Amino acid sequence: MYLHKNKKGFTLIELMVVVAIIGILALLGLRLYAGQQEKAKNSIVKANAGTIQTLIQAELADKAVEDIDDESEMNSIVTKAGIHNPILGSQQTASHFGNAAPSASTDNAGDVYVWLNLSDSVFHVNGWGADGNDVYADDLTARR
C-alpha cells in the first residue's frame, strides 16, 4: 500500500518570516503614528494661542492696555476662552503672564503663555509644545 503525503499548509520557517515582517511593519507604523500625535497636539496649542490672541485683541478694542496688563485680567481672558491643554489633558486657567518671554518649560507643555512688552505695549502670545519649546518661532502679537 502506497501512503500519499498531504502537503497542505505552511512550514514553520514561512510562518516565522511572515510574523517577523508583520512585526517590523507594525513598529514602523507605531513610530509614524506617535510623531503624528505630537504634531496634532502642537497644532491644537497653536490654535489655542490664536484664540487667546483674538480675545486679547477684542479686549483692546474696548479697553486701554493698562486695563488688562495684569495677571488676573489675563487669567480671566484665558479662562473665558475655555481652551483645553492637549498634552496634559486639562483645561488651562492660568496665562503664565509676565513682562518678558518665559523660558522653555516641559512642566507647562501644552499651555499658552502671554507676555507684555512694556516699551511698546504689545502683547506676545505663544505656547509650549510637547517638547517644552515654543510652538511658534515668532510670537503672535496683539496691540491697540
Located regions from the model:
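N-terminal signal-anchor/signal peptide hydrophobic helix marking the start
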Residues: 10-19
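C-terminal juxtamembrane segment of a hydrophobic transmembrane alpha-helix
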Residues: 22-39
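Edge beta-strands of extracellular beta-sandwich domains
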Residues: 137-139
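Conserved Walker
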Residues: 11, 28, 43
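Conserved hydrophobic/amphipathic alpha-helical signal-anchor segments
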Residues: 35-79
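N-terminal leader/signal peptides at the extreme start of proteins
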Residues: 1-10
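Extracellular/periplasmic head regions of type IV pilus-like filament subunits
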Residues: 61-131, 143-144
